[in-house]
C-alpha cells in the first residue's frame, strides 16, 4: 500500500490549498468509498481560484522560483545558525531541505519538549515538539519542525539564536551537567 499526498497549501493560500493523492488503482478502489462518506462536495470556487492563480505549469514554476527567492535567506539564517551553534556539539541533526517550507530538526532524544518550553519562556513560539508524528506523539521526544517562512530575516536570526541556546540548555539538563 503506497499513497503519496501533496498540497498547494503553502504555495497558494495557507490553510486553503488543494490537495492531491497518487496511488495504485487497487488502493484508489479501496479509498474512494471511504472518502465519499467524508466529502459531500468539493469547494469548486476554491478549485477555480487555484486554476486562475496557477494558470499552467510554466507559471506555477515561475511562482515557485519567486517563493524560493523570498525563502532562501530565511533558510540560510536557520541552517547557518544550526551549523555554527549545534553541529560542533553533536546534540542535534537536520537535513538541508531541497525545497519545501520546513527544516526538520532532531534534538537529543528526550529533549525536544523541554527545548521548546525554554524557547517559549524566552518569548519564541514554535510548532509543538513531535507535531509531524501521528497525534503529535514522538516516542523519542526529539523532532522539532522549524518553519522559517513567516518572520522577517532579522527576527528569525534572533529566534534561531534563542532556539540554539535552548537546545543546548535542554541537552545539558538531560546529560545532568
Language model features: what each stretch is:
Residues 137-177:
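PLP-dependent enzyme catalytic core of the Aspartate aminotransferase-like
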Residues 39-40, 121-127, 164-172:
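A common structural junction motif
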Residues 6, 20-22, 96, 102-106, ...:
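Short beta-strand segments
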Residues 28, 32, 102-145, 153:
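Conserved C-terminal alpha-helix-loop-beta "cap" of PLP-dependent enzymes
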Residues 1-68, 72, 172:
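Conserved core segment of the aminotransferase class I/II
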Residues 65-79, 91-106:
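Conserved glycine-rich beta-strand-loop-beta hairpin in the small C-terminal domain of fold type I
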Residues 2, 92, 124:
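Short, conserved active-site loop motifs that form the nucleotide-linked donor/cofactor pocket
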Residues 7-9, 91-92, 130-135:
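Short, solvent-exposed loop/turn elements at beta->coil junctions and helix N-caps
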Amino acid at each position: 500500500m503506497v499513497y503519496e499526498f501533496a498540497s498547494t497549501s503553502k504555495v497558494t493560500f495557507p490553510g486553503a490549498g488543494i490537495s492531491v493523492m497518487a496511488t495504485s488503482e487497487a488502493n484508489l478502489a479501496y479509498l474512494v468509498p471511504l472518502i465519499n462518506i467524508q466529502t459531500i462536495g468539493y469547494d469548486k470556487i476554491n478549485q477555480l481560484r487555484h486554476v486562475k492563480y496557477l494558470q499552467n505549469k510554466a507559471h506555477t514554476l515561475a511562482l515557485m522560483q519567486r517563493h524560493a527567492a523570498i525563502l532562501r535567506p530565511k533558510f540560510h539564517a536557520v541552517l547557518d545558525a544550526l551549523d555554527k551553534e549545534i553541529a560542533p556539539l553533536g546534540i542535534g541533526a537536520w537535513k538541508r531541505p531541497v525545497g519545501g517550507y520546513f527544516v526538520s530538526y532532531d534534538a537529543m532524544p528526550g529533549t525536544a519538549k523541554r527545548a521548546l518550553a525554554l524557547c517559549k519562556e524566552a518569548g519564541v513560539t514554535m510548532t509543538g515538539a513531535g507535531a509531524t508524528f501521528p497525534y503529535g506523539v514522538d516516542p523519542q521526544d526529539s523532532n522539532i519542525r522549524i518553519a522559517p517562512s513567516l518572520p522577517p530575516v532579522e527576527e528569525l536570526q534572533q529566534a534561531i539564536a534563542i532556539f540554539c541556546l535552548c537546545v543546548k540548555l535542554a541537552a545539558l539538563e538531560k546529560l545532568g551537567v
